[in-house]
Amino acid sequence: CHTISNWKTTAGLFHIVSEKAVVRNLTIDASCSMKCTDNGEEEFYAGFIADVNHGTLEGCINRGQISHRSGKSLMSNYVGGICGMNKYIVINCDNYGNVSSSGNFGGNLDNRSAGIYLGGVVGGSPTRPLSCAFIGYCDNHGTITYSGAFPNNYIGGIAGSHTYVKVKFCTNRGNVTVAAKSISESDVPQGLQVGGI
């Protein structure tokens, strides 16, 4: 096992974990913290172990706090305790750190595809079929908090969104708190999905 301590960061340890790569038995301890803000013009990914995972994350633990803010974003944001975007396997990974996100959508009201994807373990997954993508035997113990105004809001204890991903034997033990706002006085959030898993 390897432990990282006293680390203050604005991005994950690995920006991208590539195909066939394995990150195993790595712990981010409670002395670590992440504060991150998207650049507004591109999709944004953040997770303590990996921002984007194409490989395997196994036996990893996060105890650090993540604080994300969207600065008038035009695109979607994916934030998770272990990884922001998962495209392959996350197994036996636990999150104990609090994960929070706030901020507002900065695009035209006609652009309804942008969203916040916030989860204790994984932020989200691609919205197209992935035959092997899997989240299994993972637990979240941290508090997940979201406050903001986006067309779409997906918040979960394990994953904000896991479309086309198999999720098995996962448990959420943390609180999930959401205060989604309308993006204009005459509008309401188009999509609001909140769950323990």
Predicted regions and their residues:
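Surface-exposed loop/turn motifs in large extracellular/passenger domains
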Residues: 1, 6-197
